[in-house]
């Protein structure tokens, strides 16, 4: 997640990135091995045994190292220090767990649990990245089976790989956490996490993660919903953005810092909505919207909506980077700072994901009452449609090398564009028929359709 673990159907080059980014993706055996393995399917121990010898003959490519991937576990089989299946109130408790693949606390069977002023701690590394990332095994607090867990005034910590702090999985499973401190120290250990239509709502939180692949707010396989309000969010690990969404994540009035990653990432047909917040990222790009085709996120339109925020990236990439997907971005009234890059928007293929020649980015960017500074670029298989309204402004060049497949621009009468370099667009729709809202500044503007 969070760039968080690995995904199937990826080239080796993408595996290296995803390891540093999100998930340790699972190896997919070549087709010739799949045929050989199918002959062993009747063996009762197949799901747990590793083949002792390879099949005869020469496969078309080398066999990846590592165990055969297993099916995700059923969360009902998970064990923990405290497992509640009925309604209960807990206060002033210390609940900890030190055993691998166990949870400190599990709520299940539609239990309604209230927890106040308690301490939860988890150590003991996961032995299954899939189970911990997708189903919440080894998390500190886990909600399943339509349970509702309400947490107030507590402390939640973990120091083991694959130990997410607060994890809800399965439709109807809801965790509400308020006035609570959360701190995870190891890899793949996110703050608030939801999968398979689970929901986590947070308010007045301090969340700190130190490990790689450990976003403070995250959703993963099967989608999930996260809301966060009035939270202080800090990540320091590689591939640990403040927000990583393969579901729907909404954050309001947060302060956030990703010391070794992007501000936010949207994968597939999912969304981030960010309002009234102050967030900063330091690596790669400001925001990335993409599709990995790993199976964790459905294909469709990736969406980012940001309104009334302070958005800062110290990265050298683009403020917004779109690849291998169709995306829609709405920017309204944000203060955007990009001190180390002149690239505002980039839509382009990325060799780590998708099929060569078909993995471009396709972005619709709507700006309302928004000041934009920087260049807009796209490669030969990518497109950008920029729509500026309500007094928006752009200071920058568009497609200055004239290499993009297509970039179009719409300007309302009260919006302006000041060129900083020669620019080439497919079409220009301007409500100001005099063109006085476009300042060439000595540069050339070429409109292909005119």
Regions found by a protein language model. Give the residues of each.
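Sec-dependent N-terminal signal peptides of Gram-positive bacterial secreted proteins and lipoproteins
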Residues: 25-45
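All-beta strand scaffolds that present successive hydrophobic residues in beta-strands
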Residues: 84-92, 112-117, 148-153, 174-180, ...
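Bacterial Sec-dependent N-terminal signal peptides
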Residues: 1-32
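Extracellular beta-strand/beta-solenoid scaffold signature
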Residues: 70-79, 99-106, 128-142, 160-168, ...
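Extracellular, surface-exposed repeat architectures
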Residues: 441-450
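N-terminal segments that cap or nucleate solenoid repeat domains
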Residues: 48-128, 445
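Post-signal-peptide, soluble extracytosolic/periplasmic N-terminal scaffold domains
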Residues: 90, 107-185, 193-202
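Surface-exposed loop/turn positions within long extracellular repeat scaffolds
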Residues: 399-406, 419-430, 449
């Amino acid at each position: 997640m969070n760039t968080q673990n690995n995904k199937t159907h990826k080239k080796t080059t993408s595996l290296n990135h995803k390891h540093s980014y999100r998930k340790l993706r699972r190896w997919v055996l070549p087709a010739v091995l799949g045929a050989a393995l199918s002959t062993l399917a009747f063996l009762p121990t197949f799901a747990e045994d590793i083949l002792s010898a390879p099949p005869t003959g020469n496969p078309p490519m080398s066999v990846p190292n590592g165990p055969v991937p297993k099916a995700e576990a059923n969360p009902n089989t998970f064990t923990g220090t405290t497992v509640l299946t009925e309604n209960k109130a807990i206060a002033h408790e210390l609940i900890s767990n030190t055993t691998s693949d166990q949870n400190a606390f599990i709520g299940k069977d539609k239990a309604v649990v209230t927890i106040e002023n308690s301490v939860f701690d988890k150590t003991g590394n996961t032995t299954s990245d899939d189970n911990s990332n997708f189903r919440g095994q080894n998390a500190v607090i886990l909600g399943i089976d339509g349970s509702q867990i309400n947490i107030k005034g507590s402390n939640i910590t973990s120091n083991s790989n694959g130990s997410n702090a607060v994890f809800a999985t399965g439709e109807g499973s809801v965790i509400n956490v308020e006035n609570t401190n959360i701190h995870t120290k190891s890899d793949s250990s996110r703050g608030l996490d939801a999968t398979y239509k689970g929901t986590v709502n947070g308010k007045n939180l301090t969340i700190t993660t130190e490990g790689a692949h450990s976003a403070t707010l995250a959703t993963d396989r099967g989608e999930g919903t996260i809301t966060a309000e009035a939270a202080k969010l800090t990540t320091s690990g590689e591939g640990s953005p403040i927000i990583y969404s393969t579901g729907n994540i909404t954050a309001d009035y947060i302060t956030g810092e990703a010391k070794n990653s992007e501000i936010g990432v949207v994968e597939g047909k999912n969304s981030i909505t960010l309002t009234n917040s102050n967030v900063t990222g330091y690596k790669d790009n400001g925001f990335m919207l993409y599709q990995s085709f790993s199976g964790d996120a459905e294909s469709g339109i990736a969406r980012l909506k940001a309104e009334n925020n302070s958005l800062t990236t110290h990265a050298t990439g683009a403020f917004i980077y779109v690849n291998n997907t169709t995306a829609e971005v709405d920017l309204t009234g944000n203060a955007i700072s990009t001190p180390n890059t002149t690239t505002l928007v980039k839509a382009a293929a990325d060799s780590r994901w998708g099929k060569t020649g078909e993995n471009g980015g396709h972005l619709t960017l709507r700006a309302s009452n928004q000041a934009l500074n920087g260049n807009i670029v796209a490669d030969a298989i990518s497109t950008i449609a920029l729509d500026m309204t309500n007094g928006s402004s752009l200071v920058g060049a568009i497609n200055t090398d004239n290499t993009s497949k297509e970039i179009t621009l719409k300007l309302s009468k009260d919006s302006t564009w000041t060129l900083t370099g020669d620019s080439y667009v497919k079409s220009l729709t301007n409500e100001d028929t005099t063109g006085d809202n476009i300042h060439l500044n000595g540069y050339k503007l070429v409109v292909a359709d005119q």
